[in-house]
Amino acid sequence: MPLARSFLYVPANRDKFLDKALGLPADAFIFDLEDSVPPAEKANARAGVRAYAPKMSGERVWVRVNGLDTGLAEADLDAVIGVAGIVGLFLPKVETRDEVLRWDGMIGALERQRGLTPGAIKLVLSIESARGVLNAYDMSVAAARVVSLSFGGAQDGDLNTDLGCVWSIDGPEMLHARSHTLLAARAARFDTPLDGVFADVRDAEGFERDTALSRRLGYRGRKLIHPSQIEPCNRLYRPSEAELDYYARVLEAFDRAVAQGSASTTVDGRMIDVAMANAARRVLDAAAAWKKAG
């Protein structure tokens, strides 16, 4: 999956928003054909994807298609598979391994018809129901083109409603589902598990607090619904200078200890062994990749 932290939803039927997206600093964009597009506008949204995806630089465009049960999925796939600039698809409300296999078969057939490399179109599975949470790992490993999970825990969203819980800003009622989705993604060896949207675009402080928690849990990016969320999202999913300094000192101290015949040492009073050194290396490697990506 291409390196990304911020995934901004853009209704694909709104040329004004698509034009604006061309100049925004989000790492990736989700051109939406689903919930943000009214039924009468679905055809216009597909046309918007075809017109604007090729204009985006880099591997930045994903498309959220309509579900298999809507009668719209086939037309969505026919419209977008093979369009230049599209990395892959966000699949909404998936609940079972069989659904993933159906999507995989439909996409694979279109790839063959259109001369694409098998598996070229990647998939992110949106976890938006209790059943989806429980089946998250099995769905993750159902097809090689699945590259990440996306948690759908927005206030009054599908998962919130399915669980029957009362959403709060601190989020304890959603924490189990949020953590289970993260666990399934990591067990499937996905590098970039994605957290859900924060729906109150007026609450900048709440967004930052929730995104900081998201990163502590292990998520590496999230879906966004407003351009104002891009900068704090990119900043908060990036290691801080203090973290980078600490992990650089960890590696330096550990390498020095190994050279002296020891497999452990201490930094700032904390014991450091090979596991901690490997963790430090992962953080520093990720930071270097972000710096290279700009």
Where are these regions (language model features)?
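Expand to "…catalyze enediolate/carbanion chemistry for C-C bond making/breaking, isomerization
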Residues: 1-294
